[in-house]
Amino acid sequence: MSLKIRLARAGSKKRPYYHIVVADVRSPRDGRFIETVGAWNPMLAKDAERVKLDADRIQHWIAQGAQPTDRVLRFLDQAGLAKRPTRSNPTKGEPGKKAQERLAMAKQAEEEAAAKAAEAAAAAAAPAEEAASE
């Protein structure tokens, strides 16, 4: 039997409240569970009452092989009960392929315009030099 430490939604419509439960992976989100090991009230401001965890029972279930879900792992990491691996995706903030092509085209057009302006300035200065020498 594979176990997860996950959130089970409670509360009323538009007023969420979650129980942190140990459940079999095959059972429904709000269905049968083995034990309640905490609670999360997302409606509260970020304080100590927002997330309540039973540290001893969580450690017990992790030792038994229960895997926390991503959101629960965040809570456990903040509480110092488990370590969440850091994710590194250095290309996430970069623009997409087409946007990069558009930026390259704009940069090339800007360079060409600057080169033409430099040629025009040089051509305007050259006749003045010839007239001064004659």
UniProtKB/Swiss-Prot annotation:
Gene Ontology, cellular component aspect: cytoplasm; small ribosomal subunit
Region (Disordered): 80-134
GO molecular function, one term: structural constituent of ribosome
Any GO BP: translation
Disulfide bonds: none
InterPro entries xref list: Ribosomal_bS16, Ribosomal_bS16_dom_sf
Highest taxon listed in the record's lineage: Bacteria
Skewed-composition ranges (Low complexity): 115-134
Keywords: Ribonucleoprotein, Ribosomal protein
Family: Belongs to the bacterial ribosomal protein bS16 family.
Annotated protein name in UniProt: Small ribosomal subunit protein bS16
Species, as recorded: Brucella anthropi (strain ATCC 49188 / DSM 6882 / CCUG 24695 / JCM 21032 / LMG 3331 / NBRC 15819 / NCTC 12168 / Alc 37)
The encoding gene: rpsP
